[in-house]
């Protein structure tokens, strides 16, 4: 080996190593995947749209479930309120019935006492006439104890009830039609239900 080859040997090794480092790897494309990517823009767009629709339907379903749950809870609350209200009405009606029974019993005892009282008789003597008057105290028209013998004043029947024609106002101002809000409609419905419940309970 001569001196020049020894001195230039390092340069050759360096150039070989440098060539290995700077050598670029070959890029190889998968033809099928490349073709699918380049021709599948519409397909991917449709898939994205379908995915968005599925998500939207799922969101709507969750909203419907939440709404049903809130409506169920609201109905339960309204039912509890109605039950409490009907219990109060029943208790008040029972109290009214008890008080009316007590009043009836007291009025019956009063009427019995009055009926036990003897009628007052007074006699009037004049020149040619002798008149006997019997006074009976009773509030009930149906239970008046008329004497069997003697004169009885005839009972005058009341005039028949003739329905009068209602007078219509000549210039009745028409009420303006106005749409009610949702809150007003719910309030009106509740009032109507309470009114019906009261009527049912009274029957």
From Swiss-Prot:
Comp. bias intervals (Basic and acidic residues): 120-132, 178-191
Compositional bias of kind Acidic residues: 135-144
GO CC, one annotated term: nucleolus
Disulfide bond residue pairs: none
BP terms from Gene Ontology: rRNA 5'-end processing
Keyword Phosphoprotein annotated: no
Molecular function per GO: exonuclease activity; rRNA binding
Residue segments, region Disordered: 87-203
Alphabetical UniProt keywords: Coiled coil, Nucleus, Ribosome biogenesis, rRNA processing
Top-rank taxon, per record: Eukaryota
Coiled-coil region(s): 42-98
Compositional bias annotation for Basic residues: 165-177, 192-203
Location of this chain's protein in the cell: Nucleus, Nucleolus
A Pfam family matched in the record: Nop25
Annotated function: Involved in ribosomal RNA processing.
Family as reported in the entry's similarity comment: Belongs to the RRP17 family.
Protein name (database record): Ribosomal RNA-processing protein 17
Organism: Schizosaccharomyces pombe (strain 972 / ATCC 24843)
Lineage: Eukaryota, Fungi, Dikarya, Ascomycota, Taphrinomycotina
